[in-house]
């Protein structure tokens, strides 16, 4: 899991050597678990790695904090058997249109969506969960009980978004969470 995160960080900062990306990612994960905010992490990154710009340090800190939050939540969900979540966006002018398009869509932890492709955007960042791409402030809202499932829902299944009733979703896709 950490190796994947390191490679993603290095991809974010193309000029960054892989060992530096590994150091920064490990530091961010450690500090974030202690409750340190993204802005504080960005300042610490700048202090330790002055070759980075303030904008890059902020981008990396914000992205890694969001990604770490999502990865920890995904791990917790797998532990309790929660296989689905609802994509939630922040509903403001800075939210990507592809992420607004995903807002309210029920997704599986095992099949992350490709929001840009689903919206027909030319950019393609591949499949990812909310919070797991640069500057994303979206978050997953886990579905743990049947009561949390929306009445009429949009569900991401195998690269498409389909509409279905709560009853249909439960019959076809829901397995009781322990």
Show where each model-derived region lies.
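Structured, charged N-terminal subsegments at the starts of enzyme catalytic cores
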Residues: 1-47
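Secondary-structure capping and boundary motifs in well-ordered enzyme cores
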Residues: 16-20, 53, 130
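Generic, well-ordered alpha-helical scaffold segments in large soluble proteins
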Residues: 19, 23, 27, 31, ...
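Short, basic interhelical loop/turn and adjoining N-cap
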Residues: 48-55
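Activation/maturation switch segments at domain boundaries
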Residues: 62-178
